[in-house]
């Protein structure tokens, strides 16, 4: 039987489109995260937006990697004129036509894992989708508060036991990717084993 584990994982980077409250280092950290995604032989999947995901996409392209953007718009004109979103640093943009909440669902579901950087409400939405879908999740710690908010959400939801083996926290993008790739590979092996027993 042919091995179905795809050699290039799709890593979603979720983060704030507006980064003013994220601290001075946020853009450099996002760009380095993008570079590390390529160094880990992965593809970046992101919301075809500005801010944290944009700088991650920039890092991916500087390292010669692939970026797939998922837009809330139904087409390029709406993407640029209505949503005021960029098209550069993306190899492919998929126009979902489902606004932000629908885009977030498709974007997250299309990924093998999700990395959460500095974010706002949309980032929390993408995190909760990944959480409920039992995706491997990497929380990038930094001078922002998103990582602390997510820890508090998990604690207050009394669901920490469910995710202790699926969420990793790390401030170094390289180490975060190392840990996240391990989770993806474990997740893929578990799914493959389950499909043989079904």
Model segments located where?
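Acidic/glycine-enriched connector segments
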Residues: 5-7, 19, 27-35, 50-118, ...
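Short acidic-hydrophobic, aromatic-tinged amphipathic segments that line or gate anion-handling sites
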Residues: 93-98, 164-176
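C-terminal amphipathic helix plus adjacent low-complexity
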Residues: 182-198
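A short beta-strand-loop structural module common to alpha/beta enzyme folds
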Residues: 43-49
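Short, hydrophobic/glycine-enriched beta-strand segments
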Residues: 9-16
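Conserved phosphate- and dinucleotide-binding cores of soluble alpha/beta proteins
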Residues: 109, 113-161, 165-166
């Amino acid at each position: 039987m042919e091995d179905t584990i795809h050699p290039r994982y799709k890593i979603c980077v979720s983060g704030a489109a507006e980064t003013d409250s994220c601290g001075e280092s946020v853009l450099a950290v996002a760009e380095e995260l993008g570079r590390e995604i390529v160094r880990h032989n992965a593809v970046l999947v992101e919301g075809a937006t500005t801010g944290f995901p944009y700088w991650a996409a920039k890092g991916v392209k500087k390292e010669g990697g692939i970026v797939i953007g998922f837009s809330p718009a139904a087409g390029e004109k709406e993407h640029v004129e209505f949503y005021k979103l960029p098209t550069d640093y993306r190899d492919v943009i998929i126009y979902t036509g489902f606004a932000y909440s629908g885009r977030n669902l498709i974007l997250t579901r299309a990924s093998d894992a999700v990395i959460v950087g500095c974010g706002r409400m949309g980032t929390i939405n993408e995190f909760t989708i990944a959480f409920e879908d039992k995706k491997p999740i990497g929380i990038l710690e930094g001078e922002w508060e998103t990582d602390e908010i997510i820890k508090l959400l998990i604690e207050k939801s009394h669901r920490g036991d469910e995710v202790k083996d699926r969420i990793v926290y790390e401030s170094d993008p390289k180490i975060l990717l190392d840990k996240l790739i391990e989770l993806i590979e474990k997740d893929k092996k578990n799914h493959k084993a389950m499909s043989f027993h079904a």
